[in-house]
Amino acid sequence: MNMEITNLKSYKELVTLSAEEKTKDLKDYLNDKNRSESLIKKFKNFYMDLSRQRYSEKTLNKLVEYAEEVELKKKVEKTFMGEKVNMTENRSVLHTALRIPIEKINTHKIIIDNKNVLEDVHGVLKKIEKYSDDIRNGVIKTCKNTKFKNVICIGIGGSYLGTEFVYEAMKYYYYNMELNKNEKDQVNNFNNNYDQDNVFNVRFLANVDPNDVNRAIQNLDQYDTLVIIISKTFTTAETMLNARSIKKWLSLKIKDDENLSKHMVAVSTNLKLTDEFGISRDNVFEFWDWVGGRFSVTSSVGILPLSIAFGYKNMRNFLNGCHDMDEHFLHADLKENIPVLLALTSFYNSHFFDYKNVAILPYFQNLLKFSAHIQQLSMESNGKSVDRNNQPIHYNTCQVYFGEPGTNGQHSFYQLIHQGQVIPVELIGFKHSHFPIKFDKEVVSNHDELMTNFFAQADALAIGKTYEQVKEENEKNKMSPELLTHKVFNGNRPSTLLLFDELNFYTCGLLLSLYESRIVAEGFLLNINSFDQWGVELGKVLAKEVRNYFNDTRNQKKSDNTYNFNESTKNFIKLLLVQIKKKKKINTNLK
């Protein structure tokens, strides 16, 4: 379907409707009981509240019409069926297939190259289940015939961000599952004597900066450590340099190649290179070219290390949560479809209000890595400048995503959100804490105190405070009248509230799939390919020339290479190398 989205009938009508919406105040909308109730959407025990967005029911219905006009439903269905919606790389996009339970292997068939891909998916999952159970139960041992205690995951971008988010999100929930076998009250919740046999210390190594290597190995013993190297091609420059560095670290104590291989695992499709690296084929876990890196958490990329950390049964619950939200995304009516409504809301805010940022604000400290994952997931997917018709784009595409857990963010960047540029926010809250504590002399529990801020921030952004209110308050505080404008909050700042019962493995899966699905939907609304990332490539290509130059210069090689750096780059490279030149004579070849 060739289309310029801004020429569509519904888009033009949204231009008119949004102009009307700009004259309205959220304070009035929030007093409309019917509207407020109709904009709370429910799925399972999860709620989404859109009542603080700057649209009426009429405008929201027009947004749904727009989704229908761009044939969103049909495009989502094609994606789930395995059609090659990633047209620039001629690939299917089937991260959703990774979550389909084994009992649906025949009812949810996905045929690619005359084969049901679910058979391969569950073959790998079965291998992960056995391997992770054997690691956890001490059946697979270290070269010292002891149980592994530590895991280092080496990857970059989508090969680690999502997995790290899930690990940090669920780590203390898992620990407390062990503790809660013995009932405790909220006062005595500080007894954290975890069973160390069931706790694996997982670290992530991504940055090629050697400081990240140092951080990853700090206070670890090689004999206790399993290394998982994640690279589909086993050629990713940063990942493989880090892998070689960690292999060298392991070999400082583990001299024998056979013993060394017991401490290394790969998630890759390149068996030739994993063989050459010294990794046993039994320790190589597959994934497929229809799994994009940023959508790979539920492949062996994430499920392998997370199953070692938490047990495969818990990760199956996580996959079930993902699958249930996938099914909701695929089948629910657009007017009740939570990922679609989130996508339409972002599309509306970006295109018709020109809001270019989104703040992700989880009121749950264990989601401290969630915003970083969503930042990559959204901005690498939808940060594009060419549409699906291969034409340059002249409208807003992806917004800039950032965030920090509440209440930390309130003492950081919320000042700008309240009184600077308008930034729509998405607040994520939970009814229950992983670590509930309440003391008799406190008015509320610690978690309730957190959630008071969750609700207060949403209303403060929407309602604000007028000059008249500030003036009335000032009768008591005696602030100089000319300074009162500094305390005015304009309000009318949109927010979305997401509320879950608790963050468990299942709801963590719901949350992940919700955002994955929302970003896929938004890409179709924008008429772009959300599944390639050519913007990553140019820097890699240019880095090769700099790498070759560093190699020639530092090793004082005579080279026939011609380095075509611009003058600015030449000057700064000289500054980098000047200290080395002082120590020994080096020919920089830069004239």
Curated annotation (Swiss-Prot):
InterPro entries: G6P_Isomerase, G6P_Isomerase_C, Phosphoglucose_isomerase_CS, SIS_dom_sf, SIS_PGI_1, SIS_PGI_2. Pathway: Carbohydrate degradation; glycolysis; D-glyceraldehyde 3-phosphate and glycerone phosphate from D-glucose: step 2/4. GO terms for cellular component: cytosol. It catalyses: alpha-D-glucose 6-phosphate = beta-D-fructose 6-phosphate. GO terms for biological process: gluconeogenesis; glucose 6-phosphate metabolic process; glycolytic process. Its EC number is 5.3.1.9. One of its GO terms (molecular function) is carbohydrate derivative binding. It is found in: Cytoplasm. It holds the Pfam family PGI. The active site is at E380, H411, K540. Keywords: Cytoplasm, Gluconeogenesis, Glycolysis, Isomerase. Its main location: cytoplasm. Transmembrane segments: none annotated. Belongs to the GPI family. Homodimer. This is Glucose-6-phosphate isomerase.
